[in-house]
Amino acid sequence: MKVTVLGAAGGIGQALALLLKTQLPAGSELSLYDIAPVTPGVAVDLSHIPTSVKIAGFSGEDATPALKGADVVLISAGVARKPGMDRSDLFNVNAGIVRNLIEQVAATCPKALIGIITNPVNTTVAIAAEVLKKAGVYDKNRLFGITTLDIIRANAFVAELKGKQPEEVNVPVIGGHSGVTILPLLSQVPGVSFNEQETASLTKRIQNAGTEVVEAKAGGGSATLSMGQAAARFGLALVRALKGESNVIECAYVEGEGEYARFFSQPLLLGKNGIVERRPVGELSAFEQHALSSMLDTLKKDITQGEEFVK
Protein backbone atom coordinates (compact mmCIF):
# COMPACT_ATOMS: atom_id res chain seq x y z
CA MET A 1 0.00 0.00 0.00
CA LYS A 2 1.54 3.30 -1.08
CA VAL A 3 0.29 6.72 0.01
CA THR A 4 1.69 9.90 -1.56
CA VAL A 5 1.34 13.36 -0.04
CA LEU A 6 1.72 16.25 -2.50
CA GLY A 7 2.50 19.49 -0.68
CA ALA A 8 4.24 17.61 2.12
CA ALA A 9 6.51 20.47 3.27
CA GLY A 10 3.66 22.79 4.25
CA GLY A 11 1.96 23.05 7.63
CA ILE A 12 -0.82 20.61 6.72
CA GLY A 13 1.48 18.32 4.74
CA GLN A 14 4.00 17.88 7.56
CA ALA A 15 1.28 17.23 10.17
CA LEU A 16 -0.38 14.75 7.80
CA ALA A 17 2.92 13.01 7.03
CA LEU A 18 3.68 12.63 10.76
CA LEU A 19 0.27 11.07 11.43
CA LEU A 20 0.56 8.72 8.45
CA LYS A 21 4.09 7.63 9.47
CA THR A 22 2.74 6.63 12.88
CA GLN A 23 -0.66 5.25 11.82
CA LEU A 24 -0.41 3.58 8.39
CA PRO A 25 -0.48 -0.24 8.46
CA ALA A 26 2.93 -1.92 8.85
CA GLY A 27 4.61 -2.47 5.51
CA SER A 28 3.03 0.60 3.87
CA GLU A 29 5.05 3.08 1.84
CA LEU A 30 4.75 6.83 2.39
CA SER A 31 6.01 9.14 -0.31
CA LEU A 32 6.36 12.90 0.25
CA TYR A 33 6.57 15.52 -2.48
CA ASP A 34 6.76 19.30 -2.43
CA ILE A 35 8.34 21.92 -4.66
CA ALA A 36 10.30 23.10 -1.57
CA PRO A 37 13.88 21.79 -1.26
CA VAL A 38 13.30 20.87 2.40
CA THR A 39 11.08 17.89 1.50
CA PRO A 40 13.71 15.10 1.42
CA GLY A 41 14.76 16.40 4.86
CA VAL A 42 11.20 16.11 6.17
CA ALA A 43 11.31 12.46 5.08
CA VAL A 44 14.67 11.93 6.82
CA ASP A 45 13.29 13.53 9.99
CA LEU A 46 10.24 11.23 9.91
CA SER A 47 12.39 8.18 9.09
CA HIS A 48 13.82 8.43 12.62
CA ILE A 49 10.39 7.49 14.03
CA PRO A 50 10.52 3.71 14.53
CA THR A 51 7.46 2.41 12.66
CA SER A 52 7.29 -0.13 9.83
CA VAL A 53 6.31 2.51 7.28
CA LYS A 54 8.90 3.09 4.57
CA ILE A 55 9.33 6.78 3.75
CA ALA A 56 10.88 8.78 0.89
CA GLY A 57 10.89 12.49 0.05
CA PHE A 58 11.14 14.29 -3.31
CA SER A 59 11.36 17.96 -4.24
CA GLY A 60 11.53 20.08 -7.41
CA GLU A 61 9.13 20.59 -10.31
CA ASP A 62 8.49 16.90 -11.04
CA ALA A 63 6.20 14.92 -8.73
CA THR A 64 6.42 11.75 -10.87
CA PRO A 65 8.99 9.86 -8.71
CA ALA A 66 6.74 10.32 -5.66
CA LEU A 67 3.61 9.25 -7.56
CA LYS A 68 4.88 6.02 -9.13
CA GLY A 69 2.75 3.10 -7.89
CA ALA A 70 0.65 5.23 -5.51
CA ASP A 71 -2.65 3.73 -4.31
CA VAL A 72 -3.76 6.90 -2.52
CA VAL A 73 -2.73 10.49 -3.35
CA LEU A 74 -3.49 13.28 -0.86
CA ILE A 75 -3.00 16.83 -2.17
CA SER A 76 -2.40 19.67 0.28
CA ALA A 77 -0.16 21.83 -1.96
CA GLY A 78 -0.91 25.53 -2.35
CA VAL A 79 -0.98 28.76 -0.38
CA ALA A 80 -2.73 29.05 2.98
CA ARG A 81 -5.31 31.62 4.05
CA LYS A 82 -4.22 34.84 5.70
CA PRO A 83 -6.37 37.26 7.72
CA GLY A 84 -8.92 39.02 5.52
CA MET A 85 -8.84 36.28 2.86
CA ASP A 86 -11.60 33.81 2.32
CA ARG A 87 -11.18 30.44 0.63
CA SER A 88 -12.16 31.89 -2.77
CA ASP A 89 -9.24 34.37 -2.63
CA LEU A 90 -7.00 31.31 -2.73
CA PHE A 91 -8.39 30.32 -6.12
CA ASN A 92 -6.04 32.51 -8.16
CA VAL A 93 -2.92 30.72 -6.91
CA ASN A 94 -4.15 27.26 -6.00
CA ALA A 95 -6.15 26.49 -9.15
CA GLY A 96 -2.99 26.31 -11.27
CA ILE A 97 -1.14 24.24 -8.67
CA VAL A 98 -3.92 21.64 -8.51
CA ARG A 99 -4.22 21.48 -12.31
CA ASN A 100 -0.48 20.87 -12.68
CA LEU A 101 -0.35 18.16 -9.98
CA ILE A 102 -3.46 16.35 -11.24
CA GLU A 103 -1.97 16.25 -14.76
CA GLN A 104 0.99 14.39 -13.23
CA VAL A 105 -1.32 12.04 -11.28
CA ALA A 106 -3.27 11.30 -14.48
CA ALA A 107 -0.05 10.42 -16.30
CA THR A 108 1.61 8.42 -13.49
CA CYS A 109 -1.01 6.72 -11.28
CA PRO A 110 -4.41 7.19 -12.94
CA LYS A 111 -6.07 4.48 -10.82
CA ALA A 112 -5.11 6.01 -7.46
CA LEU A 113 -7.76 7.27 -5.05
CA ILE A 114 -7.28 11.06 -4.91
CA GLY A 115 -8.10 13.21 -1.87
CA ILE A 116 -8.03 16.98 -2.39
CA ILE A 117 -7.29 19.19 0.61
CA THR A 118 -6.17 22.31 -1.29
CA ASN A 119 -8.70 25.13 -0.94
CA PRO A 120 -11.09 26.26 -2.26
CA VAL A 121 -12.17 22.58 -2.26
CA ASN A 122 -15.58 23.38 -3.82
CA THR A 123 -13.65 24.54 -6.89
CA THR A 124 -10.38 22.55 -6.87
CA VAL A 125 -12.25 19.22 -6.99
CA ALA A 126 -14.08 20.40 -10.13
CA ILE A 127 -10.70 21.38 -11.63
CA ALA A 128 -9.28 17.93 -10.81
CA ALA A 129 -12.29 16.18 -12.37
CA GLU A 130 -12.00 18.16 -15.61
CA VAL A 131 -8.23 17.58 -15.88
CA LEU A 132 -8.69 13.82 -15.32
CA LYS A 133 -11.52 13.80 -17.87
CA LYS A 134 -9.31 15.53 -20.47
CA ALA A 135 -6.67 12.85 -19.86
CA GLY A 136 -9.33 10.15 -20.36
CA VAL A 137 -8.86 8.65 -16.88
CA TYR A 138 -11.65 10.22 -14.80
CA ASP A 139 -13.52 7.89 -12.46
CA LYS A 140 -15.93 9.77 -10.21
CA ASN A 141 -15.68 7.00 -7.61
CA ARG A 142 -11.97 7.73 -7.09
CA LEU A 143 -11.93 11.52 -6.57
CA PHE A 144 -12.72 13.09 -3.19
CA GLY A 145 -12.74 16.57 -1.72
CA ILE A 146 -11.72 16.10 1.90
CA THR A 147 -14.31 17.84 4.11
CA THR A 148 -13.47 15.83 7.23
CA LEU A 149 -12.28 18.97 9.03
CA ASP A 150 -15.88 20.23 9.09
CA ILE A 151 -16.94 16.96 10.70
CA ILE A 152 -14.26 16.84 13.38
CA ARG A 153 -14.91 20.50 14.22
CA ALA A 154 -18.65 19.85 14.46
CA ASN A 155 -17.95 16.85 16.73
CA ALA A 156 -15.67 18.93 18.97
CA PHE A 157 -18.07 21.89 19.21
CA VAL A 158 -21.16 19.74 19.89
CA ALA A 159 -19.31 17.76 22.58
CA GLU A 160 -18.15 21.01 24.21
CA LEU A 161 -21.64 22.56 24.15
CA LYS A 162 -23.46 19.45 25.39
CA GLY A 163 -20.86 18.01 27.78
CA LYS A 164 -20.42 14.82 25.73
CA GLN A 165 -17.30 12.73 25.05
CA PRO A 166 -16.06 14.03 21.65
CA GLU A 167 -15.20 10.48 20.53
CA GLU A 168 -18.86 9.53 20.88
CA VAL A 169 -20.25 12.38 18.77
CA ASN A 170 -20.67 11.98 15.02
CA VAL A 171 -22.17 14.93 13.14
CA PRO A 172 -22.83 14.37 9.42
CA VAL A 173 -21.85 17.46 7.40
CA ILE A 174 -23.13 17.88 3.85
CA GLY A 175 -22.85 20.42 1.03
CA GLY A 176 -19.47 21.95 0.33
CA HIS A 177 -16.36 23.08 2.19
CA SER A 178 -16.60 26.85 2.59
CA GLY A 179 -18.84 29.31 4.38
CA VAL A 180 -22.58 28.82 3.90
CA THR A 181 -22.04 25.67 1.81
CA ILE A 182 -20.98 23.81 4.98
CA LEU A 183 -24.15 22.29 6.46
CA PRO A 184 -23.88 20.27 9.69
CA LEU A 185 -26.94 18.06 10.17
CA LEU A 186 -27.37 18.72 13.88
CA SER A 187 -30.88 17.26 13.81
CA GLN A 188 -29.35 13.85 13.05
CA VAL A 189 -26.98 13.68 16.04
CA PRO A 190 -28.28 10.81 18.24
CA GLY A 191 -29.10 11.51 21.86
CA VAL A 192 -28.66 15.29 21.62
CA SER A 193 -31.17 18.03 20.89
CA PHE A 194 -30.63 21.71 20.11
CA ASN A 195 -32.97 24.66 20.40
CA GLU A 196 -33.28 27.07 17.44
CA GLN A 197 -30.74 29.50 18.82
CA GLU A 198 -28.17 26.76 19.50
CA THR A 199 -28.68 25.33 16.01
CA ALA A 200 -28.19 28.72 14.34
CA SER A 201 -25.12 29.74 16.36
CA LEU A 202 -23.46 26.31 16.21
CA THR A 203 -24.00 26.07 12.45
CA LYS A 204 -22.43 29.51 12.03
CA ARG A 205 -19.48 28.60 14.25
CA ILE A 206 -18.79 25.43 12.25
CA GLN A 207 -19.04 27.39 8.97
CA ASN A 208 -16.65 30.08 10.20
CA ALA A 209 -14.26 27.89 12.21
CA GLY A 210 -11.47 28.31 9.65
CA THR A 211 -11.60 32.08 10.10
CA GLU A 212 -11.57 31.59 13.90
CA VAL A 213 -8.18 29.83 13.57
CA VAL A 214 -6.75 32.30 11.01
CA GLU A 215 -7.61 35.22 13.32
CA ALA A 216 -6.38 33.45 16.47
CA LYS A 217 -3.02 32.78 14.78
CA ALA A 218 -2.77 36.56 14.14
CA GLY A 219 -1.32 36.29 10.65
CA GLY A 220 0.87 33.32 11.56
CA GLY A 221 -1.04 30.73 9.54
CA SER A 222 -4.29 28.86 9.12
CA ALA A 223 -5.72 25.56 10.40
CA THR A 224 -2.82 23.18 9.77
CA LEU A 225 -2.83 20.74 12.70
CA SER A 226 -6.57 20.05 12.82
CA MET A 227 -6.59 19.80 9.01
CA GLY A 228 -3.65 17.38 9.15
CA GLN A 229 -5.63 15.21 11.58
CA ALA A 230 -8.76 15.40 9.40
CA ALA A 231 -6.82 14.47 6.25
CA ALA A 232 -5.12 11.59 8.05
CA ARG A 233 -8.49 10.27 9.25
CA PHE A 234 -9.86 10.35 5.71
CA GLY A 235 -6.67 8.99 4.10
CA LEU A 236 -6.56 6.10 6.58
CA ALA A 237 -10.24 5.36 5.85
CA LEU A 238 -9.35 5.06 2.14
CA VAL A 239 -6.49 2.69 3.04
CA ARG A 240 -8.77 0.54 5.21
CA ALA A 241 -11.33 0.36 2.38
CA LEU A 242 -8.64 -0.57 -0.17
CA LYS A 243 -7.49 -3.36 2.15
CA GLY A 244 -11.01 -4.81 2.12
CA GLU A 245 -12.37 -3.64 5.47
CA SER A 246 -16.17 -3.52 5.34
CA ASN A 247 -18.49 -0.74 6.45
CA VAL A 248 -15.99 2.13 6.05
CA ILE A 249 -18.20 5.24 5.96
CA GLU A 250 -17.01 8.86 5.71
CA CYS A 251 -18.49 12.08 4.35
CA ALA A 252 -16.63 13.68 1.42
CA TYR A 253 -17.26 16.09 -1.45
CA VAL A 254 -17.76 14.00 -4.59
CA GLU A 255 -19.52 13.90 -7.93
CA GLY A 256 -22.90 12.24 -7.46
CA GLU A 257 -26.17 12.04 -9.34
CA GLY A 258 -26.50 15.83 -9.39
CA GLU A 259 -29.55 15.92 -7.13
CA TYR A 260 -28.32 19.14 -5.48
CA ALA A 261 -25.20 20.08 -7.46
CA ARG A 262 -22.67 18.23 -9.63
CA PHE A 263 -20.36 17.89 -6.60
CA PHE A 264 -21.77 17.54 -3.10
CA SER A 265 -20.53 16.30 0.26
CA GLN A 266 -22.51 13.37 1.63
CA PRO A 267 -21.95 10.12 3.54
CA LEU A 268 -20.14 7.50 1.43
CA LEU A 269 -19.58 3.78 1.77
CA LEU A 270 -15.98 3.16 0.67
CA GLY A 271 -14.48 0.03 -0.87
CA LYS A 272 -11.63 -1.37 -2.96
CA ASN A 273 -12.49 0.83 -5.96
CA GLY A 274 -13.31 3.99 -4.05
CA ILE A 275 -16.99 4.81 -3.60
CA VAL A 276 -19.29 1.80 -3.33
CA GLU A 277 -22.40 3.77 -2.45
CA ARG A 278 -23.43 7.40 -2.05
CA ARG A 279 -25.69 7.40 0.99
CA PRO A 280 -28.77 9.67 1.09
CA VAL A 281 -28.52 12.73 3.34
CA GLY A 282 -31.55 11.57 5.32
CA GLU A 283 -34.34 13.62 6.82
CA LEU A 284 -33.55 17.32 7.26
CA SER A 285 -35.07 19.75 9.75
CA ALA A 286 -36.80 22.89 8.41
CA PHE A 287 -33.67 24.92 9.33
CA GLU A 288 -31.41 22.50 7.42
CA GLN A 289 -33.76 22.35 4.42
CA HIS A 290 -33.72 26.15 4.19
CA ALA A 291 -29.94 26.32 4.61
CA LEU A 292 -29.54 23.69 1.87
CA SER A 293 -31.69 25.49 -0.68
CA SER A 294 -30.05 28.85 0.16
CA MET A 295 -26.49 27.58 -0.39
CA LEU A 296 -26.93 25.81 -3.73
CA ASP A 297 -26.39 28.88 -5.93
CA THR A 298 -23.09 29.60 -4.17
CA LEU A 299 -21.98 25.98 -4.46
CA LYS A 300 -22.88 25.77 -8.15
CA LYS A 301 -20.97 29.00 -8.88
CA ASP A 302 -17.89 27.58 -7.14
CA ILE A 303 -18.14 24.41 -9.26
CA THR A 304 -18.62 26.31 -12.53
CA GLN A 305 -15.54 28.42 -11.75
CA GLY A 306 -13.47 25.23 -11.54
CA GLU A 307 -14.93 23.70 -14.69
CA GLU A 308 -14.30 26.87 -16.69
CA PHE A 309 -10.71 27.16 -15.45
CA VAL A 310 -9.80 23.95 -17.28
CA LYS A 311 -11.58 24.70 -20.57
From Swiss-Prot:
It comes from the Bacteria. One of its GO terms (biological process) is malate metabolic process. PROSITE patterns: MDH (PS00068). Pfam families: Ldh_1_C, Ldh_1_N. It catalyses: (S)-malate + NAD(+) = oxaloacetate + NADH + H(+). Keywords: NAD, Oxidoreductase, Tricarboxylic acid cycle. It is an enzyme of class 1 (oxidoreductase). The active site is at residue 177. NAD(+) binds at residues 7-13, 34, 94, 117-119, 227. Gene3D superfamilies: Lactate dehydrogenase/glycoside hydrolase, family 4, C-terminal, NAD(P)-binding Rossmann-like Domain. Its EC number is 1.1.1.37. GO terms for cellular component: cytoplasm. GO terms for molecular function: L-malate dehydrogenase (NAD+) activity. InterPro entries: L-lactate/malate_DH (IPR001557), Lactate/malate_DH_C (IPR022383), Lactate/malate_DH_N (IPR001236), Lactate_DH/Glyco_Ohase_4_C (IPR015955), Malate_DH_AS (IPR001252), Malate_DH_type1 (IPR010097), Malate_DH_type1_bac (IPR023958), NAD(P)-bd_dom_sf (IPR036291). Substrate binds at residues 81, 87, 119, 153. The keyword Ribonucleoprotein does not apply. The keyword Cell wall biogenesis/degradation does not apply. Homodimer. NCBIfam families: MDH_euk_gproteo (TIGR01772). Catalyzes the reversible oxidation of malate to oxaloacetate. Belongs to the LDH/MDH superfamily. MDH type 1 family. This is Malate dehydrogenase. The lineage of its organism: Bacteria, Pseudomonadati, Pseudomonadota, Gammaproteobacteria, Enterobacterales. The gene is mdh.
